[in-house]
């Protein structure tokens, strides 16, 4: 099953919100110092494949940022955030894997947040 940021079906939307919050929190806690020091910004679109038990089954760059370091960082942060929550039974009955496609935005909003951030859209 493939889902994106536009998913509104409730069982998927709740899982997506939980997944996004976890990845974003872990990404911000582990924001790489080299990215912070160089004040790099950009966006990369990743497809993350989550198995029924929440295991990370795969990561694919759908649209690179144009900066290898940001692409590699997004992949590294997705790996750090895994394993994810198991798929809810209602989803797990329909599929063995969930393909989540999201945009990872690396921002430099020091004046607003006190530190560079990663935002998952």
Explain the meaning of each model-derived region.
Residues 31-36, 89-90:
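Surface-exposed patches in mature extracellular/periplasmic domains of secreted proteins
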Residues 63-69:
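A short acidic/small-residue loop/turn micro-motif
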Residues 1-33:
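Acidic, low-complexity proline/glycine/alanine-rich linker and hinge segments
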Residues 1-4, 24-27, 51-63, 75-86, ...:
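Conserved "boundary/linchpin" sites in short secondary-structure elements
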